[in-house]
Amino acid sequence: MRIGATLLLRNQNCVQSYSWSNIRPLGSLQIAMDSLEEYECDEVSIIRPVRAKDSIESFSKDIEAIRLIKTMTPISFGGGIRTLEHLELLRDLPVERLIFSSSFITKNKKLINKAKNLYGQQAIQCLLPIKIIDQKIFVYYCNEAKLISINKLDLSFINNFANEVVLYDISNDGLRDSFNEQIADSLSYDYPKLVLSGGIGKETIKWARKKGFASVLVDNKALHREYSINEYKNA
């Protein structure tokens, strides 16, 4: 099982997120990547935490920041890849995987197929930001900045077009050892297809490794030495 980290990128700099809403400045993207490489992180997912409104200008500036990164750590990128124009801007970007969220919710087959043709099926990830309310599962639909019932999603479409599905527990974003196991157990996907994020800690990793999940992504804590990736690898 891979043990990676999530970095949130806003205005070309990293930010910390708590409970999917509280944002705090973190600093330089390169410095964050250097720290994660030092901690022997298996992979890094760089995500732009965009909500309903975004612009090509903002997207382009963030892309250029990623293009300048110097690292040997495999990178996944997502956040705001909504059109073929966005996809075209990613050419020659030093990333191994692309992360789509709203495009899977709206079943934008044209965009996802184009990405698959350019990068390969193995490069396509679907991000589902999930929140459980009164035992019901909701997914955050970033394009419209609102929660929708998971029943509105075509899970078969996601299964067919995504190589991996990232389950992001947004209620426990920024916390430790609090990932809601019900999220993974409630979906009909095989564990080796799933990546877990939000509320990841040592005990979560032990459980995830035993179950056979593909990967876990530690959030903000991974940049603090006391919560470094090496600590989690020894869980």
Over which residues does each language-model region extend?
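Hydrophobic faces of well-ordered beta-strands that scaffold small-molecule active sites
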Residues: R2-L9, V44-I46, I75-G79, L98-F100, ...
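Conserved anion-binding
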Residues: L8-N22, R91, V95-D173
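Short, acidic/polar
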Residues: R24-E37, T83-L89, A145-I158, I205
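Glycine-rich, positively charged N-terminal anion/phosphate-binding segment
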Residues: G27-D34, D54-I66
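Catalytic domains of carbohydrate-active enzymes, especially glycoside hydrolases
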Residues: A32-I47, L93, I158-V165
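Glycine-rich phosphate-binding active-site loops on the catalytic face of alpha/beta enzymes
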Residues: R51, E88-L89, L93-L111, V166-G174, ...
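Short loop-to-alpha-helix "cap/lid" segments that border enzyme active sites
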Residues: I63-E64, F138-L167, D177-V195, I200-T204
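Catalytic cores of alpha/beta
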Residues: A65-R97, E181-V216
